[in-house]
Amino acid sequence: MTRSLVWGASLLAIALVLPNASALAHGFAGQRFFPATIATDDPFVSDELSAPTVSTIRNSGEGGGQEIDTSIDVSKRITPNFGLGFAETWQHFSNAPSGFGNLELSAKYQLLVDAPHEALLAVGVDAEVGGTGARKVGADRFSTVTPTLFFGKGMGDLPDSMKWLKPLAVTGTLGFGFPTRASTVTDPDSGDVERHSNTFETGLAIEYNLQYLQSSVQDIGLPAPFNRMIPLVEFAFSTPFNRGQNGLTTGTINPGVAWAGRYFQLTAEAIIPANNRSGRNVGGVVQLHFFLDDIFPTTIGRPIFQ
């Protein structure tokens, strides 16, 4: 077993022996609803379907063309606190061959749901399965395993003197990416080698929930559809820390807005490169997200084992 798989297995083993959290459907902690986010993963376990998520951006560099990615993401609770998921993406390029990227698998365990303090904590493992995508779109032949800590905190427990800050919430992720191969020979004749670094994966989302403002702070008379909107901004970064790539951070900043109903959520965000290494062009992404635990509460939207 590789070191990265040992890390992932150990992390899940620790989670499974901890006391159960009082998990609730799709991201509630007390009165706080945490929306599904696109660039950073959610700090909760739920039955949900993102279909589709469509992003578009013009790639930087010589001959850079338009890239349109269309993905599907499914999460399923096995127990009230433990869930599995998978995701797949079709990558379309305006000036290059198109195809599927690598399959992505995930497991997540809910460690904490603190209703009075509107806090969530979860631990999980994500894996990009090498060799499952098309070579023509540059899908890696090696896998990458990323043990991750997920957290969320609403500001509803602030004093009433700060009531206008109560609708604020933050969610985030802290993870380490471990490729199963340290390097790949890209040209057998010349012996050129591409090195695959371990990475520090960080994400943060800052949200202001207008529905929370209306229902739990003060009704200011917002009409539909604004009374269910959640303005937000996401930050997602990847920082290599060995094999000659130390500190070469890449990432994006994604400002946008989500609209959350009872059964689904619609989100639109800009994709802004965080630095020159991340690109020079601004793109966009939209996502339609379904709450399967509310749509099918007695069948496919409930945990397999109660």
What are these regions (language model features)?
Residues 14-23:
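C-terminal segment of classical bacterial N-terminal signal peptides
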Residues 1-10:
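Bacterial N-terminal signal peptides that target proteins for export
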Residues 24-306:
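Transmembrane beta-barrel domains of Gram-negative outer membranes and organellar outer membranes
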